[in-house]
Amino acid sequence: MPRRGPVAKRDVLPDPIYNSKLVTRLINKIMIDGKKSKAQKILYTAFDIIRERTGKDPMEVFEQALKNVMPVLEVRARRVGGANYQVPVEVRPDRRVSLGLRWLVQYARLRNEKTMEERLANEIMDAANNTGAAVKKREDTHKMAEANKAFAHYRW
């Protein structure tokens, strides 16, 4: 931990088109090697694809997808008397959003569509419909927490 106390959190600016901080955070997650304009192009094209295919506002679809992907519980390793226990803990709200965005981008990258725009659009639409790899990741995380419920009293 730093000697000068905790580092102040930087506030992200809302993006120019959708005026949303969530969209900016998603752009930052998509970005590789500091190429932000490329990441913006990917996301905005993906949103156009979503608008085209669903006929709905892409922001609504994205927010629904994020809601379906954000985990409520996760497990953390805790060492007790020489044994490592997977202790279920509640996920902080800011970490929930971060994990949700990270999983959306991570599993979009693993898809088989030709362009990243299509992959991201399809992963967001799947997540909004409660299907897709990112939602499965959340379910697996919750299952792990449920399976290790017995160690919940080791919470810190």
Curated annotation (Swiss-Prot):
> The organism sits in which domain of life?
Bacteria
A Gene Ontology term for the protein's cellular component: small ribosomal subunit
Single GO molecular function: rRNA binding
Q: Which CDD domains match?
A: uS7_Bacteria (cd14869)
Which keywords does this Swiss-Prot/TrEMBL entry list? Ribonucleoprotein, Ribosomal protein, RNA-binding, rRNA-binding, tRNA-binding
- Give GO BP annotations, semicolon-separated: translation
| InterPro entries, A to Z | Ribosomal_uS7, Ribosomal_uS7_bac/org-type, Ribosomal_uS7_CS, Ribosomal_uS7_dom, Ribosomal_uS7_dom_sf
List, alphabetically, the Pfam families matched.
Answer: Ribosomal_S7 (PF00177)
How is the subunit organization of this protein annotated in UniProt? Answer: Part of the 30S ribosomal subunit. Contacts proteins S9 and S11.
The family note in this entry says:
Belongs to the universal ribosomal protein uS7 family.
Can you name this protein? Small ribosomal subunit protein uS7
